Amino acid sequence: HVTGMAIRKVFSLAVGISVLCLFLCASSSKLKSNKKWHFPRATRKAFSGYIYKTYYFKQQVDHFGFANVDTFLQRYLLADQYWNHNGGPIFFYTGNEGDISWFCNNTGFMWDIATEFKALLVFAEHRYYGESIPYGPEAFTNPMKLNYLTSEQALADFADLINYLKSTIPGAAQSPVVAFGGSYGGMLAAWFRMKYPSIVVGALAGSAPILQFSGITDCEVFNEVVTRAFERESVECVSNIRASWQLINNYGMTDAGRKLLQEVFHLCQPLNASSDVDTFKDWLTGTWTNLAMVNYPYPTNFLEPLPAWPVRECCKYLSNPAESQGLLLDLFAAISVYYNYTGQASCLDINQQGTSSLGDMGWDYQKPVLMVEEEPWKTPARTTDPREAIELYRDGDAHVFKWSE
């Protein structure tokens, strides 16, 4: 039997760790830095050693209407080796915008405390991500099929899954459920507790930007947080990154300049046009953002193999005044900390950031249409090119809004 005191102990422990994590991980409002970047997912499999079983549960495509009776299979991962079958708690991870196996293998806190609290671990995949995609590939070509990608529908999926598990797993009927999540998954965990209090006794929402919406949070907050992660190491580091945008713009205007950029940064693809330069700048923006996010005080393979305090390592190359090609060479050395710390990369691919593309199609629709957050474009010490603000919805997300009309 798990007492209320034990559950409170989970929250006390988690709050302390969450506060530390928020401080170390560039703090934050977590990590929706520009029009494309979202919670990252590794391109490599995570060999965590965690043991779990994979199951599928038949879900309704539409929980709130009567016209659509279609169903899909929702994937969920279950680990019961630590569980007390006499009412031990259920720790339920509210899946993010990506493959649930990656989150399962990178949420060590849940695994660490499962043994202490004798908990059943459940990791539920979010609809339209990973393997849990209603209508398959057609979902991303037909707006009528994609219409059911909402947080409300996902929360209803989680609620139905929990009810199913508690009714079919012997000993689970009286088990208290605690929701866990980070980033968008943390938002879902918090909303899950709010919307379904009879199902979830509490939620631990790590780095969840539940207040990062218009009229609540200043739109400059995110970049200010990312900037501070670099500024703590060196003011000159921030100045050099800020100066680099105009330098890249200048080189990107000519064929010779674009060729030089490709050579200096050892890019796998040529920069043939201004659109390629824009992709290159997006890639750099995501790099600085991801570095701030994984600025842990210990070595990690979370996104890429990285040293402890990777922002500090990057800023070692950007802490002295530099101009023109000298600054470009320093930038290359800095981003190589992220992309080539092992020294095994022969070239750098601007179409990858140490994150998989499994969730990109769903998130590129979901975020601008359903989760319009204030975005940080104007902060003076920015790590993004200010010109991107003008293009944000015109070239990036505007086409998605047509789908919502």
Language-model features, listed with the residues they occupy:
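Small-residue-rich helix-loop
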Residues: 352-404
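Alpha/beta-hydrolase fold nucleophile elbow
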Residues: 171-183
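Alpha/beta-hydrolase active-site loop signature
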Residues: 98, 127-130, 210, 226
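Alpha/beta-hydrolase active-site loop
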Residues: 145-168
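Structural recognition of the beta-strand scaffold that forms the well-ordered cores
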Residues: 91-93, 121-124, 178-180, 202-205, ...
